[in-house]
Amino acid sequence: MFHKKAQVIVGITTFYDEFLGLSVPGLARLENDFILVIYNDNPNTIVKKRQIRQLGYRGGLYVINGGYNKGQLGARLAILDFVRRHKLKSDWFVFCDDDDVLTGLNVPDVSQYNFAIIQNMLVVRTRLIDVLRLMRDSGNCVIDNENVCQVRPHVGLAGTLVRYSAIMRMADVLNSVLQNIYEIDESLSFRPPVDMMMWSALNIIARHDNKMATPIYMDVANYIATDIDTCSTKYGMKLQPTKNATQQFQRAIARYDVAVRIALANENATPVGQELNA
């Protein structure tokens, strides 16, 4: 597959800034030219540019320290809002979690109808040495499905290159139904599946705007997820449902999807009174 030079923005949200010691050095090793935007969602800490430079990153950099905890969705939307307000130029955008490693930013020459580029993800489950090896050389690993496994393809927003116009359009729609989304979040007994929800919303919105829109799959690994210190709870909430996790996640995503579809339907609704002037 042919590649083309493209402008890319990488967005990272962080709560425990120590995790940036994983994600930022990984980005520093990339040969691609890109802009990094970091949103610190922990009001009790301050992340400084100097801290990021000490981790080896030398490219374009913006650091946002939030005044209060927004959560993952709010932090991601805050990054997109910052990018828009500061008119940062880009063709593509990709999110990366602070405790994961982005190992590739190559953009293939794809159709205008391809709004996202899906790739593969490596998941390190048990050994820190595997994380360090993969950070040095993402091709130097043994996928044994015990210590390291491969998700092929990786379907989600983190690690997926998305066209700038598509992700900004998604941000507009999600901001319009933010209250509905938070109400669904509060009704769940587990941590909201933000990445899955945003990916589903992106697909719904892109295909609503253009029926020809579709993601494209590139069969290479570009993302390393660390699952070593995953605990049963985070921020006071269970990471996964205790029972029937798949079904509960699917039901939650279906509820988020309804909110997105209603927002899109309301965009197309004729304001009261205007139909008389038609």
Where are these regions (language model features)?
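Short beta-strand/loop segment that forms part of the nucleotide-sugar
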Residues: 33-44, 64-67
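Acidic donor-binding/catalytic loop of UDP-sugar-dependent glycosyltransferases
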Residues: 100-111
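Glycine-rich, basic loop-to-helix element that forms the pyrophosphate-binding segment
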Residues: 67-83
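Short beta-strand-to-loop acidic/aromatic patch adjacent to the donor-nucleotide binding site
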Residues: 90-101
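Short beta-strand-to-loop element that shapes/binds the nucleotide-sugar donor at the catalytic cleft/hinge
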Residues: 116-132
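Short, well-formed alpha-helical segments that are part of the catalytic scaffolds
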Residues: 16-30
